[in-house]
Every structure is written in C-alpha cells, then in structure tokens.
Amino acid sequence: MALRPAKIDRYVDKPAYTRREYIRGAPGPKITIFDMGNPAGDFEFEVALHTAEPVQIRQNALEAARQQVNRYLQKNVGRSNYHFKIRVYPFQVLRENPMATGRKADRYGNGMRRPFGKPIGLAARLKRDQKILSIRVNRQHLKFAIEGARRAAMKFPCKCYYRIYDKEGNDVTTKILSQGL
C-alpha cells in the first residue's frame, strides 16, 4: 500500500495510541540513530529547531531530516566539529482503515463495519514550541548549523523556527544575528 500524504496525519486530534503491548502488528521505528557527530565535544552554541504549533511528525520525515542534516554537516563542518541530536521519539502508532475501491468493491469490502484500522506507521507527537532537534557547534560553524536547521524544517509538515542558545542555555538568537555570522 502506498504512503499517504503527511497532511492526513499531522494534526493532534485523536487520543494517544502508544501501548504496544495491546497493538498487534505495530511497526518498528525506522529512525534508530539519535546522536550524530561528536557527543563528547565541548561546543559554544546550540541551534535548536522548535515547532510553532502542536503537530505529529511521521518517522519518515524525522529520518529524512536526520539524513539530510547529518550529510550536510559532515560535508561542511567535519565529523568532530558538531553534535547533532534528534530530541523526539516516534511513539504514536498511526492506523488506517483500508477502503476497498474499484469494480465489485462492495462484495469484499467491509466499509465502516469495524473501522478501527490497522497500524501503518509511527509518529512523534509534539507540543507547541517543543524542540525537534538540536545542533551544537562552535562560533565559526554557526552558519552551517543554521542552514542545517533550515533544511530540516523543510522536511516537516509544520511551521518551524530556530533559536540559538549559549552554553548556559540562554537564548542569544537576536544578539548573534545582530552581530552577523
């Protein structure tokens, strides 16, 4: 079965559906690596990507963003000069009621009888202003981290914004951007 458009699953309008012990056939997570680069490194700044609205992000989008940002940072910054971390986990099990279409579909389709649906994928459920990912770098690589966050935001079905934090966790976005990169 083909992958449905992400706009179908992005809204947080249903109750959470996460208890795998009760779900038969729940798929495993496609995203397995959450820390990339140099996790033990000491970096000056952290560029964090936040959501602007409550949303569900499918695991396919998270994995696509992870691959894109990691490849971009490895190429431009070097493996030991950044720490990239995905901060959300896809717990929410998405389900679909497959509807029969085509000729004589009424003979073998169930329609809305027992319409609960079968598990088709996983998604991460995010609140407004929650961090999706963070990239820790030093000052000379800050523009590459901002560009990586921008590229990751294109993969997600919601409006996103980035913030720059210093070592202590203070928001220094306006200060850094006013000084120029």
Swiss-Prot record:
Record's family?
Belongs to the universal ribosomal protein uL16 family.
Concerning InterPro entries, the annotation shows: Ribosomal_uL16 (IPR047873), Ribosomal_uL16_arc (IPR022981), Ribosomal_uL16_CS_euk_arc (IPR018255), Ribosomal_uL16_dom (IPR016180), Ribosomal_uL16_euk_arch (IPR001197), Ribosomal_uL16_sf (IPR036920)
HAMAP family in alphabetical order: Ribosomal_uL16_arch
Cellular component, GO annotation: ribonucleoprotein complex; ribosome
Q: Report what the protein is called.
A: Large ribosomal subunit protein uL16
Q: Which gene encodes it?
A: rpl10e
Q: Which Gene3D superfamilies does the UniProt entry name for this protein?
A: Ribosomal protein L10e/L16 (3.90.1170.10)
Q: Name one GO molecular function term.
A: structural constituent of ribosome
UniProt-listed Pfam families: Ribosomal_L16
Give the matching NCBIfam families.
PRK04199.1-2, PRK04199.1-4
By its UniProt entry, which SUPFAM superfamilies does this protein fall under?
A: Ribosomal protein L16p/L10e
Alphabetized, the UniProt keywords read:
Ribonucleoprotein, Ribosomal protein
Please cite one Gene Ontology biological process associated with this protein.
translation
Checking CDD domains in the record gives: Ribosomal_L16_L10e
| Source organism | Pyrococcus horikoshii (strain ATCC 700860 / DSM 12428 / JCM 9974 / NBRC 100139 / OT-3)
Q: PANTHER family recorded for this chain? A: 60S RIBOSOMAL PROTEIN L10
